[in-house]
Regions:
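C-terminal beta-strand-loop-alpha-helix "lid" module of Rossmann-like NAD(P)-dependent dehydrogenases
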Residues: 1-332
Length: 332
């Protein structure tokens, strides 16, 4: 039991260190995402995004169709020992699928745990089936990429998603992930990425906050691991990012609006998917740190109980031997 306690305590400290790095990556990407959003909002407010004659959007990612074929990106972890982190995500995925029963749903599974769960329930599409959705099926797996996530990988992945949307194979794209705010402020989110209904406004289809008990457990785990409970102090950076490209002036763009849309909208989609994966990774480490802290506390309690039981048994044995010695001496 003491060996188990040492293992869980070490895993808690490792998760705390990884949480700090994951949190830094998630926070450092927010100003860029905010600035990109502001540029697009400024461009949309000054350019015609729909053809005045046909009413068609000037970019395919702005097109909206009846939602018959859905792509959902389910972001879980590659490893377990994170409490209910993975279970909560796959349960939310099951609820999302049930709410959209009757529609064709393709699943991109990011993370081994979610992939394993979904594989047991739904078939994996063959290469010739990927181009056409059918009921619920797994069309992609992304295993071992979240721990060392690179934007280049997400960009390539988002290009394949955009290509399917542009061809009309899918009508909407959702990302299901854990949104990280701080160690004790997270929520499970189903976010609509495509179609882009309004630049800069996240369309949350479903959200679940941590319970009070979960927040208290995470707060205790963070304190013992030396991790800050609040959000990192990025107020000045966030303020500058929020003010970027928002001045009420007429910007002069070198490229025509159509070319800017062609360059920026795909990047906007890639950034949204990348951000969701970074947030989920930070949330995963926070959940694992909490789970290992709880396991360490349980091990401490078990060690105390076993030590007490062992001492009582030893004391009873010694007492019995003394009584036997005294009784033998008295009989002589």
């Amino acid at each position: 039991m003491r060996n188990t306690r040492q293992i869980t305590k070490a895993m808690k400290m490792i998760s705390a260190a990884r949480l700090r790095r994951a949190q830094e990556r998630a926070l450092s990407g927010r100003p860029y995402a905010q600035m990109l959003t502001n540029v697009l909002k400024s461009l949309v407010s000054r350019a015609e995004i729909f053809d005045p004659e046909t009413g068609a959007p000037r970019h395919p990612l702005l097109a909206q169709r009846p939602e018959k074929n859905i792509l959902v990106i389910v972001v879980t972890a590659d490893r377990g020992l994170a409490g209910a982190f993975n279970a909560n995500i796959v349960k939310a995925a099951a609820r999302f699928l049930a709410a959209n029963e009757g529609k064709n749903i393709d699943i991109e599974a990011a993370g081994r745990k979610g992939r394993d769960f979904l594989r047991r329930r739904f078939p994996t599409a063959t290469p010739e089936q990927v181009e056409r959705a059918g009921a619920v099926q797994i069309v992609g797996e992304h295993i071992g990429v979240l721990g060392k996530l690179q934007f280049e990988y997400v960009r390539d992945f988002s290009e394949s998603v955009i290509d399917r949307y542009t061809k009309g194979e899918i009508d909407s794209v959702y990302v299901l992930y854990n949104e990280f705010k701080s160690v004790i402020a997270q929520r499970l989110v189903v976010e609509k990425v495509l179609p882009i209904e309004e630049i800069g406004e996240k369309t949350i289809a479903q959200a679940e906050e941590l319970t009070k008990e979960e927040r208290e457990m995470r707060a205790e785990a963070a304190k013992s691991a030396g991790v800050s409970l609040g959000e990192a102090d990025t107020a000045e950076m966030d303020r500058r990012a929020a003010a970027f490209a928002t001045a009420q002036v007429d910007y002069i763009y070198e490229q025509p609006p159509a070319e800017l849309f062609r360059d920026l909208l795909p990047k906007y989609v890639a950034v949204q998917i990348y951000r969701s994966m970074l947030e989920s990774t930070a949330a995963e480490h926070a959940a694992r740190m909490t789970a290992m802290d709880s396991a360490t506390s349980n091990a401490d309690e078990m060690i105390d109980k076993l030590t007490l039981a062992m001492n009582r048994a030893r004391q009873a044995k010694i007492t019995k031997e003394i009584i036997e010695i005294v009784s033998g001496a008295a009989a002589q």
